[in-house]
From Swiss-Prot:
Protein name: Large ribosomal subunit protein eL21
Similarity comment: Belongs to the eukaryotic ribosomal protein eL21 family.
Transmembrane residue ranges: none
Region Disordered, residue ranges: 1-66
GO biological process terms, semicolon-separated: translation
Quaternary context: Part of the 50S ribosomal subunit. Interacts with protein L18 and binds the 5S rRNA. Has been cross-linked to L18.
Superkingdom per UniProt: Archaea
Functional summary from the UniProt entry: This is one of 5 proteins that mediate the attachment of the 5S rRNA onto the large ribosomal subunit, stabilizing the orientation of adjacent RNA domains.
GO cellular component: ribonucleoprotein complex; ribosome
Length: 96
């Protein structure tokens, strides 16, 4: 029987915390502020289900284009096409 190709197929590693990172995430990460035009890395925090983006975009880098409620609109280029992802601060890391 063929395996299903559901939306979370192949995400065992992306949606699993390392043993040292298990439990609740640091609250500073969820309330971090980002400015428009700032470069950010998309990294899913498995401990935070809200504001998560599709796992296919995990690991990409984009530019913050503004806020939508408590979340941020991040522009990325996926396969030569510009896309806008809406994601909360818990899943964003500032590029240094």
């Amino acid at each position: 029987m063929p395996s299903s190709n559901g939306p979370l197929e192949g995400t065992r590693g992306k949606l699993k915390n390392k043993p040292r990172d298990r439990g609740t995430s640091p609250p500073q990460r969820a309330v971090e502020e980002f400015d428009d035009g700032e470069k950010v890395h998309l990294k899913i925090d498995p401990s935070v289900p809200n504001g998560r983006f599709h796992p296919r975009f995990d690991g990409q880098t984009g530019t913050v284009e503004g806020k939508q409620g408590d979340a941020y609109k991040v522009d990325i280029v996926d396969g030569g096409k510009e896309k806008t992802i809406i994601v909360t601060a818990a899943h964003l890391r500032r590029q240094e």
